[in-house]
């Protein structure tokens, strides 16, 4: 029997976990790549530290074994690093770490898995509204998410004719642990973020997961940037 496999990074919580559970509910085998384990019955956990550029040498065989026999692979680059930094303060080491997690690791996974990805497979990048705009205090994140959109567009062009499609889903402010860790416990800040969207609320991880699923299964959106942000209020 042919197998469809979701390979997803950072699925121990938030958007990643919601996505993994959604695919699993539809019969997909799920392989999670993260340092923290995934709470998903039947899920395959690969404890790879994507912030270490040398992970390929030690763990590539384990990853390839986890997708053996897959007729279709949906690769979802979800893991992300969000830091508090700015142009006057950001040093090379911290920028390099953000780029490693948010851009370089996805390309490492692309190169490793593409030889075993057949027609009908997909690569979905999880970007951010900040992939096409900027706010103060998140320089490394803004830079890396802009670069991720470029990587998606290059993926579309370089894989033309192979039957593998790609897209970049750019969530707005989503109610995740990462967002709450970044802004702190100030409910007023969270309220302000919610007020920046036309529905007046934060996005749920499940809503983004549904968008990722749609992009993974529909090749017509190949090369597209898909904004999942409830509509932003322009001020």
Language model: regions and residue ranges:
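Residue(s) in the substrate-gating loop at a strand-loop-helix junction
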Residues: 128
């Amino acid at each position: 029997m042919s197998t469809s496999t979701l390979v997803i990074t950072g699925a121990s919580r938030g958007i990643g976990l919601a996505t993994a559970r959604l695919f699993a509910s539809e019969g997909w085998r799920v392989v999670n790549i993260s340092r923290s384990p995934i709470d998903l019955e039947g899920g395959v956990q690969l404890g790879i530290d994507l912030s270490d550029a040398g992970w390929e040498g030690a763990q590539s065989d384990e990853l390839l074994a986890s997708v053996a026999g897959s007729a279709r692979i949906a690769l979802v680059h979800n893991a992300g690093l969000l830091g508090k930094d700015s142009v006057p303060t950001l040093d090379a080491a911290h920028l390099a770490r953000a780029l490693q997690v948010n851009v370089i690791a996805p390309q490492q996974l692309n190169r490793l898995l593409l030889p075993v990805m057949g027609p009908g497979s997909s690569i979905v990048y999880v970007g951010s509204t900040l992939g096409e705009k900027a706010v103060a205090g998140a320089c490394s994140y803004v830079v890396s998410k802009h670069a991720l959109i470029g990587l998606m567009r290059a993926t579309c062009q370089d894989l033309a004719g192979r039957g593998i499609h790609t897209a970049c889903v750019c969530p707005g402010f989503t109610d995740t642990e990462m967002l709450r860790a970044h802004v702190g416990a100030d409910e007023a800040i969270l309220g302000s973020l919610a007020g920046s969207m036309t529905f007046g609320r934060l996005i749920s991880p499940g809503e983004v997961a549904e968008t990722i699923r749609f992009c993974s299964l529909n090749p017509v959106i190949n090369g597209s940037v898909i904004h999942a942000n409830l509509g932003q209020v322009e001020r």
